[in-house]
Amino acid sequence: TDYLLCGICLLWMTGCSNMLDEMRPKDKIPQDALSESDLTKLLNGVYAEMEELVFKFYMDGDVKGENFKAGPGFSMNDPMSMAPSSKEVLGQWQKCFTALKQVNFLVETYEASSNKDSQVVKQTGGTGYYFRALIYYHLVTRWGGAPILRKRTYDVVPISPEADVWNFIKEDLGKAESLLPEFTDRFYVSLSVCDALNAKVCLALKDYTNAAIYADRVITKSNFALSTTSAEYANAFISNSNSKELIFALANKRSTGLLLFYQSVNDIDPTWDYSPSADCYSHLYADTSCLLYTSD
């Protein structure tokens, strides 16, 4: 009896093994099996990836515009140099494409969806197209031409001319514009942030007429207003800000996040990287006299 029972159990286990091998997912959810609940989690993951990308570029304009001075922990790059030998420059290029891989997964998921009328699916597509346009905006404004990747690939893709990259950005923003909802929360991509990037793209291309049109779409909304004092302007950069200048912001928590701006930009730590230059302090506000800061 024992031998018979063991034989039956062995037969049952080997018979089921093939069925178990064919079950999905083994270690992840297949792209074609993502539910709307899964898409929400996927969106959150892409937001986290984009936070790292934005962190890479957040201070770049100030560094290259010489608003900062270099500290003992870092040597300032020549603002006219974009040499690949620079660790910072190479890191920015690489981060664009690691983030692009995740964003393209989002875009591919939207494009393959059979339920494009769903608000969650629309948000997925609109966010993906916007983030891809933002990535390529960072690329084209620094390097000009860049490889255009509409889908994830490990193939070597040649660099496209700068004009083609700008056209790709405008194409993606057009798609995002048709999918994104109106502004409700600064921590989520909305139609307003798409309009804001469209305005920057038009400015870069010297299309001033359309730049003004896109900018007006944002400025004329009651959700937003320009700061009128230095204190109001500074309020945009603090935690839990209620500034009406904020159109889109990625949530960065010092308590849980690893991306800490104060570790790079301060003049207190022994190995600080950057701090604002004296000229930056003295010319930042028209009403500088009302501030407690000094340029020392």
Stretches with model-predicted labels:
Residues 16-61:
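Acidic, glycine-rich segments characteristic of secretory precursors and extracytoplasmic regions
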Residues 17, 145, 170-183, 191-232:
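Aromatic-residue-lined binding/catalytic grooves and analogous aromatic/hydrophobic interfacial grooves
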Residues 40, 73-142, 156-160, 178-181:
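Conserved, well-structured interaction surfaces
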Residues 1-25:
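Bacterial Sec-dependent N-terminal signal peptides
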Residues 87, 223-295:
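Elongated scaffold/linker segments in the mid-to-C-terminal portions of large proteins
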